[in-house]
């Protein structure tokens, strides 16, 4: 079929990727500048089919209530700085979602967020001692109210029957928990955001792959291809945001901005064990996070998770890591080699040598068969039966490799990195965890870095969207309590 070139269109804002990041930024800009035209480009035929899809992530509302990698122990002391920072960012997300419900942009809170207890689990003397220290430290902090702790086997089994039945308690176990954790369906949330965007005039072009992003004066020329017809079209945008998951790196590279020089990406695939037995699923209602093995990367932290997806309760365990050179679940086997540049190849090669813990972990994970996966599950659920669990593939995560700094030939980062040009006309988000949980916080950072000249004008409206904007809730318990009660009620999380 012959391809055709359509006439160039012009738009104020172009969002690449129909996932939670683009959807969140689009909603913010629509509220701040309702007259600005927006277009979303998505390679697939539906929104939220990659990392935002509910079975492609754990759906944890990451607020450091249970995730032990945010509270490392250093010289016998539990460090809380990361936990407080992550919690602060999630409070921003809660406020923004509540505001969007009040504004009618989002339609149904129960469709995308549900209250599920968050639990930290430790077994063996060392882990129990650590967990007790962690509880004693965090429970005193205003951002972690209502946290509880027990080492009692009976209380453990009452709260977590699946994990208690058949367990040998002689080695010692402990859990700390809070009832007010959340499970979030980021796929449903993305779809609600985009449905609201369409109502307010945003154009969404599904089945359109962005082939190139190049500067055109002070603007950006975006070349897209219809994946079904092969037709090529161009769009000129005043501002471009690349929220395309793993493909943000190659698209930023194509843009030619100097800020992306030296950056690379290391793709890691994931798998879950998903429970297929309804009777088993009914016996567990919590997100239970354990401790990563010594030397293992943060992504290896195992967890047994209640999920609420499309009104149905599910149960998963994992993640188990894998490796492919793809940057997206529906990506190409050539994604990684195509991303190599003279400015990043040394950093990417060096990471394999410098990150021996990650290399060892990936090799061990790749060698695991189903019996080995079930053995890992039985550390949490001792009586798990093989026939009750199926293996499903999760989303693709591309970890950030930062440029060479000092003596290190590049460094592997397990967080996110926002890249933008100095003019603030193009930005993209790299990396993975905590990802979707901090989307509103990350998109506010996009606004600050790319629209600095507008922030004074936008300030009052941003404060309406996020009442705590510009304030550290950790130092203002009164405001924290106010926004907590507001979000609990508006998001229908009150019991």
Label each PLM-derived region with a short phrase.
Residues 7-21, 39:
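Beta1/beta-strand and adjacent pyrophosphate-binding region of the FAD-binding site
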Residues 30-54:
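Glycine-rich FAD pyrophosphate-binding loop
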Residues 59-158, 313-314, 326, 332-335:
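Dinucleotide-binding Rossmann-like beta1-alpha1 core, especially the glycine-rich loop
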Residues 81-94, 121-129, 176-196, 205-207, ...:
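Short beta-strand to alpha-helix junction loop
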Residues 108-120, 158-200, 221, 357-361, ...:
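Helix-loop-beta segment of a Rossmann-like dinucleotide-binding subdomain
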Residues 171-180, 188, 323, 327-457:
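C-terminal catalytic lobe of FAD-dependent flavoproteins
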Residues 173-239, 437-450:
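Helical element adjacent to the flavin cofactor pocket in flavoenzyme catalytic cores
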Residues 242-257:
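Flavin (primarily FAD) binding-site architecture
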